Amino acid sequence: MFVLVMICLFCQYWGVLNELEEEDRGLLCYKCKKYHLGLCYGIMTSCVPNHRQTCAAENFYILTKKGQSMYHYSRLSCMTNCEDINFLSFERRTELICCKHSNYCNLPMGL
């Protein structure tokens, strides 16, 4: 009878215990200074975001004379106080994409 009660108590909290274990493991992000079309020009490593950090992908574009954006390269990292935003200057555009929904979510897709 005691074993049955213990099993019932443990089963009640099974989902909560699993969620805590996943949080303890932490999020993993790619880290690369220059990433272009599936290759890291340098060393591809991982980083674990600290407090108030998320995975980040900074995509750099060159602006053509016609005003169109042409993809140049990306920088992958863990970034503090990251927010999705676009920066535009006369010669280039920088797109900052932040994520924390899954491990290695900062890998650019379709570039």
From Swiss-Prot:
Name the cystine pairs: C29-C55, C32-C40, C47-C78, C82-C99
Q: Which CDD domains match?
A: TFP_LU_ECD_PATE2 (cd23578)
* UniProt source species: Mus musculus
Compartments annotated for it: namely: Secreted
Q: Which domain of life is it from?
A: Eukaryota
Q: Write out the similarity annotation.
A: Belongs to the PATE family.
- The gene that this protein is the product of is Pate2
What is the name listed in the Swiss-Prot or TrEMBL entry for this protein? Prostate and testis expressed protein 2
Residue spans making up a coiled coil are: none
State if Signal is listed as a keyword.
yes
